[in-house]
Amino acid sequence: MTDHSVDRYFITSRKLGILMISDLEKYDSQKMYKIYDDWPKIARESYESEQELIDFQNIDHIVFAGMGGSGAIVDLFSSILSKSDIHVSLIKGYLLPKTVDKNTLVIITSVSGNTDETLTVLNSAKKIKCNVIAFSSGGKMEKFCYNNKITFRKIPKFHSPRTSLINFTYTILKILNSILPIEKKDIMDSLSELDRIKKEIDSNNLSDSNPAINLAKWLSNIPIIYYPHGLEPVATRFKSSLQENAKTHVITEDVIESCHNGIVSWERSSEVQPILLQGKDDYIKTKERFTIIKKFFIKNNIDFKEVNSVSGNILTKTISLMYLLDYTTIYHAVLSKIDPSPVNAIDFIKKEISENN
């Protein structure tokens, strides 16, 4: 029987070769890994940077809008605020909810500033009597906001939208400090945790003690990521990063919902690899489902891996897991001799959209 005992993140995987810094230099053409080496530093500098703070009054509804790498940012904020008293809506598309009114704050995020869906939402928000703030590195969004007197904050892009999650997140936390019900202690705890896990997972530790490398080596086929509701943004981010960086197909399933349908697919032999993404403080019934699913996998000789969050607040859990799993996708890409940076298919889609507009 396979040993499925868990350390802080997940069990040590089988060895599939040695990853060396020369491999990262060879296959990571735009040196994405170096940005991740600096993620904790970028996060801290972003939060401590001088920013013109914003205070909107009488807000009882926050709408986050963003796609792709920017969408991961709004997913993260939606998760952070999930237990607050503020009504939170998430837009991944073109349309604002009809519940938007004068007490709504619409937060628009597009790292590039040129995202078609997000620009459409921004234009719609302009026509409604609601509060709006937009964040981007420039692009069409900056010009639109300037021409229409919409509150705008420019945040630099690091490498690509997906790698810029870290500085956008902590800059927004700083700028919207008076609006977002997030304790400063929670933010500082998250920064400390990033500093801590960097030593385990960055490119200065390419040994078998690196949990991101171990998971990257274990992955050899299509992964299916089982997640609890509170960690859905982490699962979605992991899926997206595997798709963009490692150019691989990925499946995600809510662990509770999967017990009513998805689990049946394991009655057929499959090369799909299950990853169980778990929170330290998951609801007791959720923990029970994970235990049952693990029992089912072991009984049926299905190899799986577990990824557990650290203890702490939701920001610390989500950002540290995203850090770990983003690194996993880079290492997996390089081990597969794939350049993690280019996204040629996305470039094709953007070109087609631009030509059709």
What residue ranges belong to the model's regions?
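A generic structural motif
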Residues: 88-93, 248-259, 303-312
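Active-site phosphate/pyrophosphate-binding segments
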Residues: 28-35, 42, 50-54, 60, ...
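Glycine-rich phosphate-binding loops that contact phosphosugars or nucleotide phosphates
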Residues: 53, 57-199, 217, 279-284, ...
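Conserved, well-structured ligand/cofactor-binding cores
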Residues: 30-56, 97-102, 188, 305, ...
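C-terminal active-site/capping subdomain that shapes the small-molecule cofactor and substrate pocket
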Residues: 264, 269-344
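Short, small/acidic-rich helices and loops at N termini and domain boundaries
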Residues: 339-357
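Polybasic, low-complexity association/targeting segments
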Residues: 17-29
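N-terminal amphipathic/basic-hydrophobic helices that include classical n-h-c signal peptides
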Residues: 1-19
